[in-house]
Amino acid sequence: MRRAGDRKHRMIFHKTGIPGVFAIELEFNRDARGFFARSWCENEFRSHGLTPRIAQCNISFNERRGTLRGVHYQSPPWQEAKVVRCTKGSLYDVALDLRPDSPTYRQWFALTLSAANRRALYIPEGCAHGFLTLEDQTEVSYEMSEFYHPEAGRGVRWNDPAFGIVWPAEVKIISDRDRSYPDFVSL
């Protein structure tokens, strides 16, 4: 049940072409001081059929434009959902559907997240995630539904032809691990 005034603080969930992946916009209450916006609300997630849980929050700071991180996921039983947002700079954020029973298996969705647009991307369990920074000094915040389990950490290569992800800028910095994932074979 909403309280009076809650309407000005909604999170607006936009469906994407991938089931369970949502682009999230915040509704701002602005005045002379600046603004107020709700960035997390369990009821808002539940109203979209999502079961929110925050087990861990992470921050990724990226010195240079063209830094690519990903494309990562955790294998069962440690699969994770995440909400990704940019708190400084901007990035091109990618969700890749790796759920074999999904109608969008091996398809991807991308969205530009920035400190200016304050959008977020919800990525469900079974989808991989990666991003490319579009500005120097880009900071990314993640709310994760599961703790990090190194033994369950997996990834697919950012330029694997099995997916055809189109990145909007040159990849200049990438870890050896992310660069060396083998060609994808069905899960």
Where are these regions (language model features)?
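Conserved metal-binding segment of the jelly-roll/cupin
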Residues: 113-136
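Non-catalytic, conserved peripheral segments adjacent to functional cores
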Residues: 6-117, 137, 144-187
